[in-house]
Amino acid sequence: MNKKVITVALALVLAGGSYAQNDATKKKVKAYMVSDAHLDTQWNWDIQTTINEYVWNTISQNLFLLKKYPEYIFNFEGGVKYAWMKEYYPEQYEEMKKFIEEGRWHIAGSSWEANDVLVPSVESSIRNIMLGQTYYRQEFGKEGTDIFLPDCFGFGWTLPTIATHCGLIGFSSQKLDWRNHPFYENSKHPFTIGLWKGVDGKQVMLAHGYDYGRRWDSEDLSKNKDLEELAKHTPLNTLYRYYGTGDIGGSPTLGSVRSVELGIKGNGPVEVISATSDQLFKDYLPFNNHPELPVFDGELLMDVHGTGCYTSQAAMKLYNRQNEQLGDAAERAAVAAEWLGTAIYPQHTLTEAWKRFIFHQFHDDLTGTSIPRAYEFSWNDELISLKQFSQALTSSVNAIAGQMDTRVKG
């Protein structure tokens, strides 16, 4: 009898222990740690400073970290900045390509530049992604899968639609926390992780990354209480967390990278993942298999903070719109001329013209929030693109007109 009691008691203890273990595993927080060194192409400095100082800091510092810390993954956005790395720092660029191939230097954002997404036309936004993806495919044999805009001043309802039509699956930003005017009350962002539905009903996964300048000092992040608390804001028990630097490029601090490494090896209640910017989105595909994901159907504007961006530096907005319209007209005429066999399609000229003015749609450039000297470079590039589009349009129309039979009876 006593043996039976002992056996039953032991079974209950073991079952209870197993249940507690399963329950702990079930409740374990998952933290996707997304490193970044967001670099403003122009803001309180001009493009020359960006190329000579900040681009160099970004590539050199992160190559050092990638060699020193085996779990470190770096995310960096903006195809034009990769092009500058290739032009100005070719030796480091070739070294970086090896880490891209290994998946440790991650191409974030899919686009030619981290542009404003409210002032540019839809055509420009799609071109921005197309130009970026083309560059990444040709240079690295890879493409991006997400829209990565940590620092833009609001996001229109068309963005999920544009993203899905370009084959992208996710969107992240930290800027929604700036919607801190009482006007927003408790609706700064609809959720921290969920689905965002566009105007046509197509959806991307949305992740709020929090402050991209977050730092830690060599602590075990698997036991970090802040990460645990932030994860409670989603029904997924999951956190998407930027860390690194903002505006001037560079890299996360040594202490921050060590903290992520310690967290990966730690045994606390947080499962720490050194993540690419799109890993969370890929882990939840297909989205319709996850009914627990909340859905937002609307726009995410910054009505207070970003309002002046729609009118500041009116000349930039004029040049930008002229380029959008002239570029469209030039391409239509050039296609017609080639189809008629009267001219060769000027692909290189048109591509370079689009690239040159589209990167000035950057969220501190076209928006009118940079220093006056920065616009000396911006206006110059806008005018060069206008000239190139104008020449392509004129030559194409002349080629078409030269083949037209305008003879009529007198």
What kind of region is each of these model predictions?
Residues 1-5, 21:
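Short, Lys/Arg-enriched, disordered terminal segments
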Residues 15-20:
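C-terminal segment of classical bacterial N-terminal signal peptides
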Residues 4-14:
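Sec-dependent N-terminal signal peptides
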Residues 21-410:
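Catalytic-domain carbohydrate-binding cleft regions of carbohydrate-active enzymes
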